[in-house]
Amino acid sequence: MSTDGNNNKKGSKEGPKSSEISKFDLAKENPKLAEWMDDCIKRMNSLYKDTNINICNVMTGHEIISIIRMVEAIFMEESNLCEAEAPIKVIGDIHAQYQDMNRLFDLIGRVPEEKLMFLGDYVDRGPQGIEVLILLFCLKIRYRDRIYLLRGNHETPSVNKIYGFYVECQYKYGIGLWWDFQSCFNRMPMSGLISKRVLCMHGGLSPELINLDTIRNIPRPCEPLDRGLLIDLLWSDPTNKGEGWFHSIRGISYMFGKGVVEQACKSLEIDLIIRAHQVVQDGYEMMTGRRLITVFSVPNYCAQFTNAAAVVCLNANLQISFQQMIPPPLPEGTKAKAAPAIAIDPNIDAARADKDAIKPFVKE
């Protein structure tokens, strides 16, 4: 059932079963599925700029479960290391800021006209995580070769049960849907490789990342443990405190310095690493020259920061540019601050060496 933004009734049409997915180019091979996805995308787009309704007004729980089943089947057909060709745009954390994600699309373009790779953290902290996921899932089903969805650390049950997504699912559709999403998250790819030369992930590097096959060979479905390659891909952070590996101030995974980035680029035969995971004031921050980029893609994060949003753009020749969305004014009285620099190449004379908080790690 198609609806516009003023219709407060839930849709009633039952979605196609996951078995209707064709193995290749499913939208062209299955006109019925393509028509339904177009309708779902239209309904999801009706929520943009209309804050009086949410996804419950335009999508039934049964439809959402059908969409989840279809997209997780597509994820399982993809490699853990999704390979895509440039030109492409790389998008960082969204954190349930559905309205801001759509404003970003207004700036950078939408699928299928643009090819996009998301680096995870679709849920938590903001109010519309289900909306973010279902729009992106519908786009993935409809245009699977134009959009790539990687897993973030918030796409794990131990995190999103605490930071908002569990309560959102409970309020909108019931706890059962939260479990369906966890099953889907366990099937999402962990990393992306653009034109064989640009490695993308949510968190960062790992002492266990020996070659790209170590990513490809991570079994799925999988739920992260407390350590290991998958945890590092989701959780690790760069630091300008030194060259090597350090224990993370997060209490999980590691921090890695300039020397680790340079060695990884050499051993993995890549030119650039793009990751997300940390809010940065300009929406992007570079380390080790342009060998590592952190990107964050929604503004005014949690209304606690005054950060801009940004997207990393790679043209066909892998030349880098950025599209930036300036943050809109926050409501009067909001106590927000600038996001701190995280690992920007420092002035060596001004760099602080926090030896107590950042402790070196030596791989055994």
From Swiss-Prot:
Q: Which amino acids does the record list as binding Mn(2+) 1?
A: 93, 95, 121
One GO term describing the cellular component: cytoplasm
Cofactor(s), names only, from the UniProt record: Mn(2+)
**Which parts of the sequence are annotated with region: Disordered?**
1-24
Here the segments flagged for biased composition (Basic and acidic residues) are 11-24
Under Gene3D superfamilies, the record lists: 3.60.21.10
Keywords, in A-Z order: Hydrolase, Manganese, Metal-binding, Protein phosphatase
Ligand binding (Mn(2+) 2): 121, 153, 202, 277
Q: Which residues form a coiled coil?
A: none
> Sorted alphabetically, which SMART domains does this protein's record hold?
PP2Ac (SM00156)
- Keyword Hydrolase listed? The answer is yes
| EC numbers | 3.1.3.16
Give the active-site positions. Answer: 154 (proton donor)
Question: For this protein, what does the record note about how its cofactor is bound?
Answer: Binds 2 manganese ions per subunit.
Cite the Pfam families for this sequence: Metallophos (PF00149)
Query: Which family does the similarity line name?
Result: Belongs to the PPP phosphatase family. PP-1 subfamily.
This chain belongs to the protein called Putative serine/threonine-protein phosphatase C06A1.3
Specify the species.
Caenorhabditis elegans
